[in-house]
Curated annotation (Swiss-Prot):
InterPro entries: Ribosomal_bS16 (IPR000307), Ribosomal_bS16_CS (IPR020592), Ribosomal_bS16_dom_sf (IPR023803)
Domain of life: Bacteria
Keyword Ribonucleoprotein (UniProt): yes
Matching Gene3D superfamilies: 3.30.1320.10
Name the UniProt record assigns to this protein: Small ribosomal subunit protein bS16
The organism of origin for this protein: Xanthobacter autotrophicus (strain ATCC BAA-1158 / Py2)
Biased composition regions of type Low complexity, renumbered to the chain: 111-122
HAMAP family in UniProt: Ribosomal_bS16
PANTHER family in alphabetical order: 30S RIBOSOMAL PROTEIN S16, SMALL RIBOSOMAL SUBUNIT PROTEIN BS16M
PROSITE patterns: RIBOSOMAL_S16 (PS00732)
Disordered as annotated region, ranges: 81-122
Bias-annotated ranges (Basic and acidic residues): 83-110
Length: 122
């Protein structure tokens, strides 16, 4: 049985509220869970103390038992100091694509050709 520490959505339409739960990985997102270890209310301000409420002792115990946190829960656990989350780094994502590089190169060539013509005319 693979255990996950994940979010189970509750609340009304357009008013999300999440429980941080321990659940079998095969169970539905909002379905049966083993234990509730906290809550997350995304509607509160980011600096509000009630935005993420987490029982650190229970979370630590489940991590020691082998439960795997999802990405979002891993952020919460990292903020609480319970586990270290590696920073994601994708430097290629910020680079322009092939076509954009070609267009930029063409613009630079046109600008260079235009400035040499202006200098020759003077």
């Amino acid at each position: 049985m693979s255990l996950k520490i994940r979010l189970a959505r509750g609340g009304a339409k357009k008013r999300p509220y999440y429980r941080i739960v321990i659940a079998d990985a095969r169970s539905p997102r909002d379905g049966r869970f083993i234990e509730k270890i906290g809550t997350f209310n995304p509607l509160l301000a980011k600096d509000a103390e009630n935005r993420v409420v987490l029982d650190a002792d229970k979370a630590k115990a489940w991590l020691e038992k082998g439960a795997q946190p999802t990405d979002r829960v891993a952020r919460f656990l990292d903020a609480a100091g319970l586990m270290k989350r590696d920073a994601k780094n994708n430097p290629k994502k910020g680079e322009p694509g092939e076509k954009a590089k070609e267009r930029a190169k063409e613009r630079a060539e046109k600008a260079a050709a235009g400035s040499t013509e202006d200098a020759a005319a003077e």
